[in-house]
């Protein structure tokens, strides 16, 4: 298919089909992934698994001599299950993450097809398409420019050049001609149109496979903390296991006459048994279920957060959102509905046609029927033209654009030199204070305009002004001699055309969400480009000034409204020391530029705050990078999304509050799992040590402990990780990022429960030891083992209610994961007891014995329920 570079109509549907068949889809081949077998074998690199395998092979050698393979088979089965279950869940989490990252290929791109501008997913672009790009867009495919207006591209992903000037003429001394633009580069300034020349793997980025093969693996703060915890527990477990090994072996040498003989094989077997016990103690001490619990929690949270309009791009964002203390939010789209409409337009000049042309050409937005594509403010103006029965496309066709300076947040205006009805004009649209400063007008008219603007701004309306200046024939004898826009602006003799008030209503759920965040101890700060009056009104409407009693500054004094508000210009003028002092008191920053937002984030972080920032524009990228959690908007630019950790698909502040709840609930669920597993570990360690002291047979065998620790804890991780988020966590104040995951209350609970369970189980062991003539028999040890498992079974209910005074049965029927796990543990224990035999050192129990054990051990749950009811009563009396 020939590509006509001068073609502005775009492809027809038939041409699109032909191009896709010939050149393929605009999708990069995914990077080579590690095979499933390698991923699975990686699970066997775990030091604990390797120790178990060594023990299992030694046991296997002895089993061949003794012809008793049951324990060996039990160990191999336990290792296989532990590695396979871990592999399955990690693989499942990876698949879920791949599904989420694939959504980036759905990113909308503006193209012209059949003469109309429309949005299509990035992967639907074909060779020959005419693509429209502007500031903040990621170039979706390779192509050659048709139209270029002050276009600057960041080609650092390919050439290392951060800024490259682009035009339609080509040439230049760069790595690529100036009229060539490449996939995955970023538009930093201006706008343009290009015809696609290569898609997918045929693009330059596809050839070098640079971006597509990036594989990053960053350890999150929580992982680092849990690594320390696992290391500490491993050391304790190692000391205990060595001590138990020595005590058991010395006791056996002193009491067993076989050590005086020459049966070296029997002696080796005894040493192996105690070695296996020592290894098992290490296995018991190390919380192997932790990585799985984290993986599960993150994977489940990511999937559920997607349903609540939070697309998590970086895993650490899940956990960090739970520790956020300050949210710096934009106004447009996040706090408002992002459905802008012209509320009022006051003409200040008689030339209505010139105003219509100014609105049409001083804009990068497009309309697809009534659907707006592009900047919401500019879209509102085009919709206003349509409501006046005027076609913006026809107006653009009537005017010949000679030069154009795109809108930027730094300059706060857009300017276009155009020829209209044979005359040349400089047409300016922008912030009223900038545009009015360019205009030549009587003071009374200027004051009237300022009063009108002030009235609108106090109603939280966005205001714009339009002005023009006729370019005299003496200034421009020909098109080539058109002076620069900067030269014309310096004259300051413009004529004011119109003042415009654009309204964007506050989202209905935002005030409640802000209140919820403040109740949760999170400060909300509004950082907006609007005027001080507009920003203050927005702040009042959403409730950041809601309770004057709470307006206490960082120094403990009441802060006035003046101290809580600041403009970007005032903020820039402050020294670092002054800015540091004021940062915490600021509630609203108006007329803010991206650099102001970044500086505010930096100062808040110096105070030790954990900061989340929203941003939708390219210039927000530095602040999004700087923040602990960068939150881009679904409607934002590609650059902003690239810099962010999470994307708010619906742009709403309510989604930020939800993300905080998810983050805190995730942390709480991990604490619940830790509580459950460490209680099991403490109880088992004390039992084995206690058994060594009184000289009885090991109360729990290697295979029994492996079942409890590797398999049952895996089920517990699944149950507790799948618990839904709770709004209760929003009643707490934010945790410090440095806080240890096991707080004082948890540590007390772990030790209390662990010691209490040990006392009960140890008393049972001594009773059985003294009652029987030949020590504890297999039947009694089976009852002992089942009692131990059932105590942990009921304690899972207490773990579910950790950090809450609510009953463990609240929403029980909705917790399907919990019900499934409880059923699996019960069925698994029954199968082991009934059919485990020599492998698990068990004999079948009668129905009566099962009922007695289940009933007696349920006291663990009922004591917990009484304690929670007592705490509820205390809270009720306090309130």
Model-derived regions: residue spans:
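Generic alpha-helical transmembrane segments
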Residues: 712, 757-758, 782-797
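Alpha-helical transmembrane segments of multi-pass integral membrane proteins
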Residues: 749-764, 790
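Transmembrane alpha-helix entry/boundary detector in multi-pass membrane proteins
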Residues: 777-781
């Amino acid at each position: 298919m020939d590509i006509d570079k001068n073609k502005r109509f775009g492809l027809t549907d038939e041409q699109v089909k032909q191009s896709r068949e010939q050149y393929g889809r605009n999708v990069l081949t995914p990077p080579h992934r590690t095979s499933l077998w390698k991923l699975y074998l990686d699970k066997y690199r775990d030091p604990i698994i390797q120790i178990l395998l060594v023990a299992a092979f030694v046991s296997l050698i002895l089993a061949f001599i003794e012809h008793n393979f049951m324990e060996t088979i039990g160990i191999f089965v336990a290792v296989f299950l532990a590695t396979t279950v871990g592999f399955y869940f990690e693989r499942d989490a990876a698949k879920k993450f791949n599904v989420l990252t694939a959504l980036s290929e759905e990113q909308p791109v503006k193209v012209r097809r059949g003469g109309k501008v429309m949005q299509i997913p990035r992967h639907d672009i074909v060779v020959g398409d005419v693509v429209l790009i502007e500031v903040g867009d990621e170039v979706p495919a390779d192509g050659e420019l048709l139209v270029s207006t002050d276009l600057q591209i960041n080609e650092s992903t390919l050439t290392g050049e951060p800024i490259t000037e682009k035009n339609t003429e080509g040439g230049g001394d760069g790595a690529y001609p100036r009229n060539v633009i490449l996939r995955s580069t970023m538009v930093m300034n201006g706008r343009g149109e290009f015809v696609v020349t290569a898609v997918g793997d045929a693009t330059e980025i596809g050839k070098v496979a640079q971006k597509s093969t990036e594989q990053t693996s960053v350890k999150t703060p929580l992982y680092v903390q849990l690594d320390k915890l696992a290391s500490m527990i491993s050391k304790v477990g190692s000391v205990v296991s060595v001590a138990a090994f020595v005590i058991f072996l010395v006791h056996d040498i002193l009491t067993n006459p076989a050590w005086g003989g020459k049966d070296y094989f029997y002696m080796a077997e005894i040493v192996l048994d105690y070695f296996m016990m020592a290894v098992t103690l290490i296995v018991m001490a190390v919380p192997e279920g932790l990585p799985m619990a984290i993986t599960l929690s993150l994977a489940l949270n990511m999937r559920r957060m997607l349903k609540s309009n939070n697309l998590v791009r970086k895993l650490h964002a899940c956990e960090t959102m739970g520790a956020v203390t300050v949210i710096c939010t934009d106004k447009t789209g996040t706090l408002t509905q992002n459905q802008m409409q012209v509320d009022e337009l006051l003409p200040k000049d008689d030339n209505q046609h010139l105003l219509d042309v100014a609105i049409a050409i001083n804009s990068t937005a497009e309309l697809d029927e009534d659907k707006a594509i592009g900047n919401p403010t500019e879209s509102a103006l085009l919709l206003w033209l349509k409501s006046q029965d005027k076609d913006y496309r026809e107006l653009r066709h009537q005017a010949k654009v000679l030069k154009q300076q795109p809108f930027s947040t730094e300059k706060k205006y857009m300017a276009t030199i155009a020829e209209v009805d044979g005359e040349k004009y400089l047409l300016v649209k922008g912030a009223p204070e900038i545009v009015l400063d360019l205009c030549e007008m009587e003071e009374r008219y200027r004051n009237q305009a300022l009063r009108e603007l002030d009235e609108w701004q106090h109603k939280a309306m966005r205001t714009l002004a339009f002005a023009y200046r006729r370019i005299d024939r003496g200034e421009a004898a020909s098109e080539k001699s058109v002076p620069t826009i900067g030269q014309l602006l310096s004259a300051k003799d413009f004529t004011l055309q119109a003042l415009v008030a654009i309204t964007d209503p506050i989202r209905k759920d935002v005030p409640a969400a802000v209140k919820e965040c403040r109740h949760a101890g999170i400060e909300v700060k509004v950082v907006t480009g609007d005027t001080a009056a507009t920003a203050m009104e927005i702040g009042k409407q959403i409730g950041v000034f809601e309770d004057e009693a709470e307006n206490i500054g960082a120094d403990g004094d009441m802060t006035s409204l003046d101290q809580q508000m600041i403009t970007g210009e005032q903020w820039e003028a402050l020294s670092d020391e002054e800015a540091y002092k004021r940062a915490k008191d600021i509630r609203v920053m108006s007329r803010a530029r991206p650099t102001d937002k970044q500086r505010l984030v930096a100062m808040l972080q110096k105070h030790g705050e954990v900061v989340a920032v929203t941003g939708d524009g390219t210039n927000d990228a530095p602040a999004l990078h700087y923040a602990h959690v960068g939150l881009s908007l679904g409607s934002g630019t590609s650059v902003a999304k690239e810099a962010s950790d999470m994307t708010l698909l619906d742009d709403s502040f309510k989604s930020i509050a939800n993300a905080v709840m998810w983050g805190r609930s995730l942390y709480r669920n991990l604490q619940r799992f830790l509580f459950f597993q460490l209680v099991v570990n403490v109880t088992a360690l004390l039992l084995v040590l206690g058994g060594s002291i009184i000289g009885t047979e090991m109360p729990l065998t290697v295979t029994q402990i492996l079942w409890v620790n590797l398999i049952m804890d895996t089920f517990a991780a699944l149950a507790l990780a799948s618990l839904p988020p709770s709004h209760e966590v929003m009643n707490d104040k934010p945790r410090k990022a440095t806080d240890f995951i096991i707080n004082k209350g948890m540590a007390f609970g772990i030790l209390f429960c662990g010691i209490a369970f040990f006392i009960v189980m140890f008393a049972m062991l001594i009773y059985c030891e003294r009652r029987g003539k030949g020590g504890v028999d297999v039947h009694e040890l089976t009852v002992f083992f089942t009692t131990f498992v059932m105590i942990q079974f009921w304690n899972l209910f207490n773990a579910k209610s950790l950090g809450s005074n609510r009953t463990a049965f609240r929403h029980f029927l909705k917790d399907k994961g919990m019900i499934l796990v409880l059923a699996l543990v019960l069925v698994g224990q029954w199968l082991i007891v009934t059919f485990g035999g020599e492998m698990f050192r068990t004999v079948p129990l009668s129905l009566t014995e099962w009922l007695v054990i289940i009933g007696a051990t349920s006291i663990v749950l009922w004591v917990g329920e009484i304690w929670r009811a007592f705490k509820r009563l205390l809270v009720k009396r306090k309130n």
